[in-house]
């Protein structure tokens, strides 16, 4: 049987809590000691655990711990746990009294479901987006694009959704409108109305999202083409031909061991035709057994008759049999791609919205290009300051060309060297896959570069000689515009007779994967100079951003670079010997003394070549960061 006042027990259990703490938990010891002292000094009866809350220094956490100790004590002696009884409702109490009872029960932690008071369960309100809002427009756009059957990319959704909303679906950086109605996609994802998959990201309506979108369409009388828009989505655009799902990399493997009979005109045939010629040589090209029989399965050229010979496929892309209004789509190495013929696309530069002349002249480059009758566009770029794109005149789809520019003033370059941004940007530029990477160096100085003159000279030589980047040196922003206009003229001329192979990967894992797929296509298709392989602009934006999911290796390197004095070269060199932070921490734990830990990095990498060398001072700093 429990005594009428449990104060002594509560004091005893508080002392047990204090005794269970270690010396390092000094703050908790002080907290519990004050609570114990205040409880001893407080007059009154303490029976229920909730009664302890009126003591200064005892809050919900301490009360819960003492309540748990009370439950354990009651189980040991075989008695019921004290619970506050409900006041008897004799019918004279009104609704306000009933509310007070429920409130008191909630405070006391008593489950009202076990009482005669049935608390109504509040039904969760169904999420319905406001009419003409961003979420409303996105749902209707996904319904219109048939996104219940196939994923849709962000630009297609934005284009289709704009007519359903009163707000802009795209940010306007020139007017400092950095947010748009597209941000409502987060709410749709939260309420499981939209599913996001793949990289670049593709958006699909869930079953609930499809029902809600159709309800909104019917409620507002919106007329969407009744035909299943999935049929148009299967081709991604009304201008696309049906995609052949056969993987032509398998065809390449099948044909690799085959040789052709002599050609009638006696020309040399190496059988080394590109997959592009095989796939786009005819719209009716099919991989069938009887067609493979056209070639002889022999390692030497036979002397077969004319019936066994085949004609060489055309080398010039202009000879490919394509319809001007139809874009063909094929697959290679499980990646879809399209062929854009010369003349079916326009070329212009895209300028990063942060690339300005000054805070008061944010559209300098755009206006300067416009004055020279040169089209350009301002966007937020994931990488680079200026990049050239090709835009299909029929579909409006954009792809990234092989030219990217990083613009730097001398003082900005000096600061990027000092805080390691230069090496990080250089590394990302290499992963972009662009063959022509330029550093545009403006020799204007907005602030003092201090003692960075020698470092700048070294960096400029490294850019040219070691990293093989091209460099454009200008006097000021006006001179930069002239040089960029001249470069644009050269780029347009070089693509006048060039066809583009535009890639559409659906599940890129990383920036290295992005570059690897591009290299595979370049090795296969760019054997002649009249073709160029490239990713879409949307893929570039999604993959090349700094927010890309990093591997453990990249995270380790990034953390090492947070230590002042550790450059990218040093971080990469350290990571090769300590693959993860766990390896590094274990190495420090094995040191027998603090002095050994301080000298560990110096002893390992003190004689490393060049920029990889770890000095004694840097070794001590690393030990202070990771060992102590």
Swiss-Prot record:
Question: Which Gene Ontology cellular component terms are annotated?
Answer: Holliday junction resolvase complex; nucleus
Q: Which Pfam families match?
A: ERCC4, MUS81-like_WH
Residues in ERCC4 domain copies? 348-445
The Gene Ontology biological process annotation of the record reads: DNA catabolic process; DNA topological change; double-strand break repair via break-induced replication; mitotic intra-S DNA damage checkpoint signaling; resolution of meiotic recombination intermediates
Name its cellular compartments: Nucleus
The Swiss-Prot or TrEMBL record lists the needed cofactor(s) as: Mg(2+)
Instruction: Give the top-rank taxon of the lineage listed in the UniProt record for this protein.
Output: Eukaryota
Can you tell me which family this protein belongs to? Belongs to the XPF family.
Q: What is the protein's given name?
A: Crossover junction endonuclease MUS81
